Amino acid sequence: YAVGPDKAIDTNKFFVICANVLGGCMGSFGPKEKNPETNKLFGTTFPVITIKDIVKAQKYLVDFFGIKKLLAIAGGSMGGMQVLQFASLYPDAAYSAIPIACSASHSAQNIALNELGRQAIMADPNWKKENSSPDKGLAVARMAAHITYLSKKGLQEKFGRKLQDKGSLKFSFD
């Protein structure tokens, strides 16, 4: 939406680097990979990765490209946290930082909601099973997380006291 030809981050004018998150599931080595020592999935034995670790890997990539200084570092949500960490670790590496929809630290409420999601995942019977995914727990965790993404107005529209596209009260959601 914001990145591309003639958009806010215009790829006709700027070279955009968008790397996968270290330890993520889309092209990076992570918990779904097999541990070469045990030939089993890493799963919960995979090393903990922090925002700082991710940013250090990103800086390594920038250095590998031979880029001396970036015009800007931009990101939203967890990407915004990476922007803040990058600017903190490498204050002279970019001319500007554009953190979007993030904060430097979580509130107690955010930490509690994240723990709710973790507990939902760990309560799933598939949590500890090898070669399976706790899909039901992940679904509940996503529902809890979704609440944190909505504005007050968005929450009211989605969960307000009026019936949502229904003519009468029911005990089911169908």
Q: Where on the chain are the PLM-derived regions?
A:
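Alpha-helical scaffold segments in carbohydrate-active enzymes
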Residues: 60, 85, 89, 143-146, ...
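Alpha/beta-hydrolase
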Residues: 110-174
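Gly/Pro-rich cap/lid or specificity-loop segments adjacent to the active site
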Residues: 1-81, 88, 92-104, 109-113
